[in-house]
């Protein structure tokens, strides 16, 4: 099976996207076809031995739409500086809307001004256009005022009738039929006007035809403008990569797209880092807020990794490029968000099914309502009014926009906070999670050993740490690196390098330092060497019971002291777990540590359950056991050995600093490596799902109530008959409300 993404053009409402899905799903070998109206994109899974891309494109084009294989954008490429096509289209719509509004207002004044009880004495019509004495002139004036409006709304007729002729009627078809019927009927009535017969002048409905188009155009313009805002997260990310980069060796400024991995770039203060890399020289603070959601600048020095698109704030950095093109962190983020916005949530399936039959059903209801009122004895003008109102008030757009707009805003909001969500389906499924399983190392803890206690047997802690760092400086062990790091942080000088360094596997090391024989290692090494450790033995046992690693240091057979190294708990872990509890979730800690050490960490952060002594390959088994017991599990981890467990869980969540394999296996990626983003992701899921439900409820209720009213239900019960103009206004408002509600989600504080 092969999965491809196609850009689809010519779609205007949910009926359009449903038509594209319907025709492509009928192709042999197509397993799945999902069309996202907002993203204007189709994701299709098919058997390449049974159908080709050319056949897929041909099928879509035959249905009246455009299709081309989606090309991955080169995010590292320079940003286009020309006019944004979307912005140009918005400007065109705005110009045409202004023209339509001016002529529609004039038409309303001419056609209906004399019907007002108080009249319009300030702007009287010349006698030449009097409805009573010069009926033909009165009718021709209305026609002349209506024609510019119809021209500005020409796309409704072009798209609507094209879709109708292709057998895929859409919202434009409804508007086009309704407006055209009013216009044609008015033209016929106009030609029936003679000097002797003026009665037909009362049957002119040019204003209905024109005002409906103007109001629907207003709704479309507002919808397009708001839809542009829903895509702002992607747009902002794509603008982060600078157009050019400065090569350190030659000092030349070159296009970012021409930079290769291994090149060294010079990044000046106040400029953006062009691509991912490692700092080879210099120190600075780097602002990564747009990429990770981290509000505070991050300190960078030699050896630090930097992300392309982040801002170098105050120092000069030399950066060796490690990733270019589609492999950069920024490109991966954009691809992640685009994929999420292009995929549908299961909750939208009902709306999609309704949208597929919506327009034909509305046309049938309009015809049926017209026939019933005609049989009831109403004149043609009344019947036409009902027919037009039903067509115009129906809004498949509200149904089609309900889910994708909320998902687009929700995933964009997540990306803004450093929370990447793989798909709309994950957004929906995440809301059902009731258990969060946390891997310990790198998730609850920092994942890097650090000195937690320095206990001298005599002398000072600084003196002990100085000797320990000097001895350990030649060792490659992670625990040794932690001790050296602690000494550097306290700005302690380690003095001379140790001599006669000897590694003692399973015990520690021996070295000569300033004429003294220094031992560094565990209890076994001290006992074998005859060093008395009784003064710190109980302390060592207590630290070991907490999951820490105590190391003894001795010189010439005398105990110098004890240094304990551990993987410290992240500062935010306890608060994050408390937030998960507030959301009603059960939190489980999964670790390979001993029971005593695991329970100590669990008590520190406040988890509900601890599962200790778990081998890496057993993590997925424990997740599956929880799932089998009826729990909906979110697994949170960062390492390669977490990938199977991430896949086994209902939702897999990878900490951003983790391995590429873990990130690829995950459904959600936390760019900040902050456990507090887990409850934020769950809240985002709940808010987005609530927004989708609100949108769908509004869309279904609007159509369920609006169509019967337009068909004359209120009139039959003694109430008023809905005008096509008000029907058009209501239809426009429904789409705007749906998009506006989705945009409201973007203002929420997670």
Residue ranges and their predicted role:
Residues 1-139, 227, 331, 335-343, ...:
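Flexible metal-binding regulatory segments at protein termini and peripheral loops
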Residues 1-2, 18, 421, 433, ...:
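Conserved ATP-binding TGD loop and adjacent catalytic N/P-domain core of P-type ATPases
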Residues 29-50, 54, 204-206, 236-327, ...:
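Conserved cytosolic catalytic loops of P-type ATPases
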Residues 81, 197, 210-269, 300, ...:
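Juxtamembrane coupling segments of multi-pass membrane pumps/enzymes
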Residues 81-103, 159-182, 334-366, 383, ...:
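Soluble-to-membrane junctions at the N-terminal ends of transmembrane alpha-helices
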Residues 91-244, 353, 454:
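Transmembrane helix-loop-helix hairpins at the membrane interface
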Residues 95, 310, 434-476, 484, ...:
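ATP-driven catalytic headpiece of P-type ATPases
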Residues 116-136, 165, 184, 413, ...:
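Membrane-embedded alpha-helical bundles of multi-pass transporters
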């Amino acid at each position: 099976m092969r999965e491809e993404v196609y850009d689809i053009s010519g779609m205007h409402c949910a009926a359009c996207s449903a038509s594209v899905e319907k025709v492509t799903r009928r192709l042999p070998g197509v397993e799945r076809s999902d069309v996202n109206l907002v993203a204007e994109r189709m994701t299709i899974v098919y058997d390449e031995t049974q159908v080709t891309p050319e056949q897929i494109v041909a099928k879509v084009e035959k249905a009246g739409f455009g299709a081309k294989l989606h090309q991955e954008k080169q995010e590292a490429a320079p940003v286009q500086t020309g006019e944004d096509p979307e912005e140009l289209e918005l400007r065109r719509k705005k110009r045409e809307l202004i023209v339509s509004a001016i002529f529609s207002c004039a038409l309303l004044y001419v056609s209906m001004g004399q019907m007002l009880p108080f009249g319009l004495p300030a702007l009287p019509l010349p006698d030449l256009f009097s409805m009573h004495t010069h009926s033909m002139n009165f009718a021709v004036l209305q026609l002349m005022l209506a024609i510019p409006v119809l021209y500005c709304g020409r796309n409704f007729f072009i798209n609507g009738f094209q879709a109708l002729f292709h057998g895929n009627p859409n919202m434009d078809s409804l508007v086009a039929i309704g407006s055209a019927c009013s216009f044609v009927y008015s033209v016929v009535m106009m030609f029936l006007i003679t000097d002797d017969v003026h009665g037909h002048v009362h049957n002119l409905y040019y204003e209905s035809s024109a005002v409906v188009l103007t109001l629907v155009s207003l709704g479309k313009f507002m919808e397009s403008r708001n839809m542009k805002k829903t895509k702002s997260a992607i747009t902002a990310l794509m603008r982060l990569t600078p157009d050019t980069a400065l090569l350190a060796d030659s000092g030349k400024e070159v296009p970012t797209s021409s930079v290769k991995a291994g090149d060294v770039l010079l990044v000046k203060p106040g400029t953006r880092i062009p691509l991912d890399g490692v700092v080879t020289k210099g120190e600075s603070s780097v602002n990564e807020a747009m990429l990770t959601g981290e509000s505070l600048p991050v300190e960078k020095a030699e050896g630090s990794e930097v992300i392309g698109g982040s801002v170098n704030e105050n120092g000069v950095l030399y950066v060796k490029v490690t990733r270019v093109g589609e492999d950069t962190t920024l490109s991966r983020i954009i691809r992640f968000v685009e994929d999420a916005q292009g995929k549908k949530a299961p909750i939208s399936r009902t709306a999609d099914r309704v949208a597929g039959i919506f327009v034909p059903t509305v046309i049938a209801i309009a015809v049926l309502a017209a026939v019933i009122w005609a049989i009831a004895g109403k004149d043609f003008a009344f019947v036409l009014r009902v027919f037009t109102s039903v067509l115009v008030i129906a809004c498949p757009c509200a149904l089609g926009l309900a889910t994708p707009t909320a998902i687009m805003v929700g995933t964009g909001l997540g990306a803004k906070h450093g929370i990447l969500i793989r798909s709309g389906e994950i957004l929906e499924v995440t809301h059902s999670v009731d258990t969060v399983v946390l891997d310990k190392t790198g998730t609850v803890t920092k994942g890097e050993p650090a000195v937690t206690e320095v206990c001298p047997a005599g002398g000072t802690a600084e003196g002990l740490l100085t000797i320990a760092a000097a001895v350990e400086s030649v060792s490659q062990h992670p625990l040794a690196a932690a001790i050296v790091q602690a000494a550097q942080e306290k700005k302690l000088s380690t003095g001379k390098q140790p001599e006669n360094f000897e590694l003692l596997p399973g015990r520690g090391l021996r070295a000569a330092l300033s004429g003294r024989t220094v031992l560094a290692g565990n209890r076994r090494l001290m006992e074998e060497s005859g060093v008395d450790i009784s003064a710190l033995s109980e302390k060592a046992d207590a630290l070991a019971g907490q999951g820490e690693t105590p190391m003894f240091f001795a010189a010439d057979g005398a105990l110098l002291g004890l240094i304990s190294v551990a993987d410290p708990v992240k500062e935010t872990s306890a608060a994050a777990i408390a937030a998960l509890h507030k959301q009603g979730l059960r939190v489980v800690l999964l670790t390979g540590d001993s029971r005593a050490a695991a329970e100590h960490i669990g008590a520190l952060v406040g988890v509900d359950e601890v599962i200790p002594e778990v081998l890496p390959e057993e993590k997925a088994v424990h997740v599956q056991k929880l799932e089998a017991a009826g729990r909906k599990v979110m697994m949170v981890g960062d390492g390669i050995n977490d990938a199977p467990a991430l896949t086994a869980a209902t939702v897999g969540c990878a900490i951003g600093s983790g391995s590429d394999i873990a990130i690829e296996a995950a459904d959600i990626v936390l760019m900040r490596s902050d456990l507090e983003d887990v409850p934020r992701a769950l809240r985002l899921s709940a808010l987005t799902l609530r927004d989708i439900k609100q949108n769908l409820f509004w869309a279904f209720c609007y159509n369920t109530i609006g169509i019967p009213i337009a068909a004359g239900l209120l009139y039959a019960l003694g109430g008023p008959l809905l005008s096509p103009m008000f029907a058009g206004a209501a239809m426009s408002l429904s789409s705007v409300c749906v998009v506006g509600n989705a945009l409201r989600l973007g203002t929420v504080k997670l």
